[in-house]
Amino acid sequence: MGAIFTNIAEIFAKSGWAQIFFTEGGWKYAVMLAVACVLLYLAIVKQFEPLLLLPIGFGMLMTNLPLDGIFHMDIFINETNHINWELLGSSGGMVDYIYLGVKLGIYPPLIFLGIGTMTDFEPLIARPSSLLLGAAAQLGIFFTFVGAKILGFTNQEAGAIGIIGGADGPTAIYVTTKLAPHLLGSIAVAAYCYMALVPVIQPPIMKALTTEKERQVVMTAPRRVSKTEKILFPIIVTIIVALTLPDAAILVGCLMMGNLMKESGVVERITKTAGNELMNIITIFLGFSVGCTTNAATFLNIQTVEIIVLGIIAFGVGTAGGVILGKVMCVVTHGKINPLIGSAGVSAVPMAARVSQKVGQEYNPRNYLLMHAMGPNVAGVIGSAVAAGILINRFG
């Protein structure tokens, strides 16, 4: 009988339970498991960005179960900052190989390809001034870069943190893997959480910066855009961006390729594949592998708190930047632009545009801002990719 109890004790001593409850740093595992459960709750019950928060949350859950060894960070984050292919071959598991798509910058451009097949640039083409609102909303990126530098982050880390202000998860992941891969988990979680909280974060800022009269402005219907314009737009944008800022070419190019596939109407089968099956598969791989990087050792520190605070500042300043420029355009056009559409310049598509619509209808039930707000919204997608290219060009 004694031998049986001895064996049971030895099994327990080598279990994850013992690591959590009877080791000095075991509490960190418990905290991370709690955080993972919160993310899963937000995804499942509150339905906040469930397509990404669910796989990220479950990846976080898996990687913080002691002794499972599901992900080996030292393969990717080391003194050389290059992949240790020898260690990958000898010790790598499934998640390590899936994470190669993140580390090598494969998944975010493919996500952009899928987004392109679902994006309608007609509101932007019909009203090119929307591009200015999309650009103004990127103010949060560069404002937060300065704030991160003041807190002692390096240029690379500050650039990766600042990109949260673009409200574009794939772009944030892409920039972080290029500039500060050791911060990937914290930045990805912050970026997607704030994207999910757009309806909570934006309205108070929008109302604080606009008057009731401005919120009631009714905009005239935009002009009709021809099929030729829709086909030429992605081609022209790709050429201009790639020649001006090569580091943004892959993100913008994939976005525009997806859109050209959609607008041309000649490759319907692969358009559906890119926007559905391919994008769904990549989303699973991206979310789960990023979640697996959020282990207790790299996530539970003061830097994560600073990133969360800086992230919400970035988002708030970006929203304010778009609204303020919207107010300027309202004055310049003698009241033809509703400043509320400026908040849609962040690239949370189409959620930010829906927020503009909702706030506008609170003050004028007959006001329909959704299509007008989609112009700055899709401009924000391009703007965040261009901002990413600038940061990578300067600090990569």
Place the predicted regions along the sequence by residue.
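N-terminal alpha-helical transmembrane segments of multi-pass membrane transport
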Residues: 1-77, 90
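Hydrophobic transmembrane alpha-helices of secondary-active transporters
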Residues: 39, 99-125, 258-261, 279-301
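Alpha-helical membrane segments and immediately flanking helix-loop junctions
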Residues: 104, 112-118, 133-143, 147, ...
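Entry/N-cap segments of selected transmembrane alpha helices
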Residues: 124-145, 295-322, 373-377
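Membrane-embedded hairpin module used as a gating/binding unit in multi-pass transport
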Residues: 193-266
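Transmembrane helical segments that form the transport core of multi-pass membrane transport proteins
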Residues: 238-322
